[in-house]
């Protein structure tokens, strides 16, 4: 599996803010949009070449008409089809889930200097308390907090975390409120030697591996955890660790060494009866930050049964640049590809609720504390893109291999001649 990738600059992402033009991404995904851009430009370029070299005027009338019609069809047909799908799309009637997106607005550059973790916990819980004030029903509610909100989670021993204990005690006051939040978590391993290339030594016989995780907690001891698997190269993970970790050690360990899951897993928003027994599970896919840029990755959540998607992120590192706005808009494409509603929590913004058409139903402002309340629809249907995967990408990869083989065979043939 490729460990270095950067899908941020896919041409198909260019339509993230004009979702009415790309509703057919539910079939072909974002790479289908890249193919559309490529084909449209190629057809226009071909017409310009025909006109500039005079060959256009040597075509007969039928050839001219066919060439012009083909170019127009490539350019306009997908957009017209998409507009028809956009205005004809109806939100499925059925179950919904109440959600609250929390935006604590904590500057990551001063996160550990200006505020203690306990103070940050108070900020978040005050926001949640405000959102829950006046709550009378006992149906499930999902509260979502941003990526890496805390850094004191030890996998397999959550009781060591003051944050976990504080959240659990708070949630005991609110029946069926589930809190999804991000955490830097750690796995301690006892071993005489390094258990893996990515493990760092704590002391003799003790090693630690780090994760960028999402935790789902309620007022019980039954916590769920998911480790981010699409990690940012260098910042979070060292690619091809058998080779690069040795180089990183020589440089003093400047690269990240987070360990992710090999396969995605779901988290459940749970409804419990008065005795605490689970009576209903709502399976959710939680994309942690950079994961939301990967179409196939998000589709995998839905293949595994996710009825809705959540995105937790901390986009404050970029400052007031186009990055955080682009990151938000890409979530709209994931909604179209999977036809799933999305709730998005971003530390300093922009948090949002996005429907299955890709429209941003509601959102917060940038760099200010906020609480966003709403509902998301739940769905069990799978789109063609989810069911069949990224066929455009696979087809292009196959064609690239065939083209390479053709070039090699052709070159060898010329040498023999």
Regions found by a protein language model. Name each.
Residues 1-417:
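Enzyme catalytic cores with a strong preference for nitrogen-chemistry domains
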């Amino acid at each position: 599996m490729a460990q270095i990738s950067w899908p941020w600059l896919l041409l198909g992402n260019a339509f993230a803010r004009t979702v009415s033009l790309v509703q057919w991404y539910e079939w072909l995904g974002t790479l289908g949009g890249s193919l559309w851009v490529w084909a449209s430009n190629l057809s226009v370029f071909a017409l310009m070449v025909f006109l500039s070299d005079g060959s256009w005027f040597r075509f007969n009338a039928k050839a001219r008409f066919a060439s012009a019609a083909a170019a127009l069809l490539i350019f306009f047909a997908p957009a017209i089809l998409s507009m028809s799908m956009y205005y004809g799309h109806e939100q499925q009637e059925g179950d919904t889930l109440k959600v609250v997106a929390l935006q604590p607005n904590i500057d990551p550059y001063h996160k550990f200097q200006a505020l203690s973790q306990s103070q940050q916990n108070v900020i978040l819980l005050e926001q949640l308390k405000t959102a829950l004030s006046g709550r009378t029903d006992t149906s499930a509610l999902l509260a979502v907090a941003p990526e890496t909100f805390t850094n004191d989670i030890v996998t397999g021993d959550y009781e060591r975390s003051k944050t976990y204990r504080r959240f659990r005690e708070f949630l005991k006051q609110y029946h069926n409120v589930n809190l999804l939040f991000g955490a830097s978590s750690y796995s301690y391993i006892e071993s005489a030697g390094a258990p893996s290339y990515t493990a760092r030594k704590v002391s003799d016989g003790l090693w630690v591996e780090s994760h960028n995780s999402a935790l789902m907690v309620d007022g019980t001891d039954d916590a769920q955890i998911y480790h981010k698997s699409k990690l940012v190269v260098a910042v979070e993970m060292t690619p091809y660790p058998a080779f690069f970790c040795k180089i990183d050690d020589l440089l003093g360990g400047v690269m990240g060494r987070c360990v992710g899951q090999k396969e995605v897993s779901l988290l459940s928003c749970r409804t419990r009866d008065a005795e605490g027994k689970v009576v209903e599970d709502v399976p959710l896919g939680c994309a942690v930050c950079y994961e939301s840029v990967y179409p196939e990755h998000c589709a995998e959540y839905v293949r595994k049964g996710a009825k809705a998607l959540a995105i937790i992120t901390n986009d404050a590192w970029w400052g007031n640049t186009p990055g955080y706005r682009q990151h938000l808009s890409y979530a709209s494409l994931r909604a179209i590809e999977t036809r799933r509603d999305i709730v998005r929590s971003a530390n300093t913004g922009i948090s949002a609720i996005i429907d299955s058409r890709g429209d941003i139903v509601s959102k917060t402002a940038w760099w200010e504390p906020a609480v966003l309340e709403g509902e998301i629809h739940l769905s069990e249907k799978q789109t063609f893109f989810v069911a069949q995967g990224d066929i455009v990408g696979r087809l292009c990869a196959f064609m690239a291999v065939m083209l390479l083989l053709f070039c090699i065979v052709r070159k060898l043939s010329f040498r023999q001649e």
